[in-house]
Curated annotation (Swiss-Prot):
Protein name (database record): Nucleotide-binding protein amb4396
Similarity annotation: Belongs to the RapZ-like family.
Record region (Disordered): 1-20
Record lineage: Bacteria, Pseudomonadati, Pseudomonadota, Alphaproteobacteria, Rhodospirillales
The protein's role, per its UniProt record: Displays ATPase and GTPase activities.
Molecular-function GO term, any one: ATP binding
Binding site for ATP: G29, M30, S31, G32, A33, G34, K35, T36
Length: 306
């Protein structure tokens, strides 16, 4: 996600029936990781978004007017009055004790070098770098908020997330129309560019025959039938897919039973263009046939516009 502070927000209309008024999400994380964009996206989805409300007033806001007409998103960071790990966790526990509320903690993270670039490009001062170098301020904040990351129900890393993909992730976790049931993100990726940090399950496809070394297949991707057929012709493909689906069949309902709203499954190969793409496509189709909610992303292809 490049420059979360200045990227324009898609203008999507809120659902006609907002509903879900018993839901509360506390949005926190690293400064510059996308809290403002997240709150705006949630607002576009029908949530009431309130930023930097003093923590002592959070419970009062929930109870005001005899309850909430819409679900509530509370933005909290180190600029918030009374901010601290203990006060945030105390407010979270207090809200969770309110009868009938579904309360979640969303933590937004991002790699330090990308945060540095965002603050430098936007010429904004990091709130903890007033009297110290920018990177030192970021590292100090990371140490401060690390207990919140460990406690989070949902963690989204925005390092490589385009704004549109970031909003789709938020919609998957918090969209009012998707209340209930487990949704699955399937993503392909290149090992040479690092693991997707949001992945819950990771599978390695590098043992399969590589279409990269077939001249007529090299410029294509795993979306193309010729590449998909080449990958599927590998004798190891069938047993791998069978083992993978047999593993996922009982796992998916167990994740749903634990209250997980979205699961990210990542499939990797060397370049992220052929084998991992073909398997991710196959896996997404299998899940769709089961009637599941599936979103498919090819990280390397999407970033290159392939």
């Amino acid at each position: 996600m490049s420059d979360l502070h200045s990227s324009p927000t898609d203008q999507t209309s809120a659902p006609a029936h907002a509903g879900g008024g018993n839901r509360v999400v506390i949005v926190t994380g690293m400064s510059g990781a996308g809290k403002t964009m997240a709150l705006k996206a949630l607002e576009d989805m029908g949530w009431e978004a309130v930023d930097n409300l003093p923590l002592a007033l959070a419970a009062s806001l929930v109870r005001s007017g005899g309850g909430m007409a819409r679900p509530l998103a509370l933005g909290v960071d180190i600029r918030t009055r009374d901010f601290g790990v203990e006060p945030v966790l105390a407010a979270l526990d207090h809200l969770m004790g309110e009868s009938g509320l579904d309360v979640r903690l969303l933590f937004l993270d991002c790699e330090d070098d990308v945060l540095c670039r965002r603050f430098t490009e936007t010429r904004r001062r990091h709130p903890m770098a007033v009297d110290r170098p920018l990177l030192d301020g970021i590292r100090h904040e990371r140490a401060l908020v690390s207990p919140l990351k460990r406690r989070a129900d949902v963690m989204i890393d925005t390092t490589n997330q385009p704004p549109g993909e970031f909003k789709r992730l938020l919609a998957g976790h918090f969209g009012l129309e998707s209340n209930g049931g487990l949704g699955v993100f399937v993503t392909s990726f290149a090992y040479r560019n690092g693991l997707p940090r949001e992945a819950d399950l990771v599978f390695d496809a590098r043992f399969l025959a590589n279409p990269h070394y077939v001249p007529e297949l090299k410029p294509l991707t795993g979306r193309d039938p010729a590449v998909a057929q080449y990958v599927a012709a590998d004798p190891a493909f069938g047993p791998f897919i069978e083992s993978l689906t047999r593993l996922l069949e009982p796992l998916l309902p167990r994740f749903a039973a634990e209250g997980k709203s979205y699961l990210t499954i990542a499939v990797g190969c060397t370049g992220g263009r052929h084998r991992s793409v073909a398997i991710a496509e196959h896996l997404a189709q299998w899940m769709q046939r089961r009637g599941g909610k599936v979103e498919l992303r090819h990280r390397e292809l999407d970033e290159r516009g392939s």
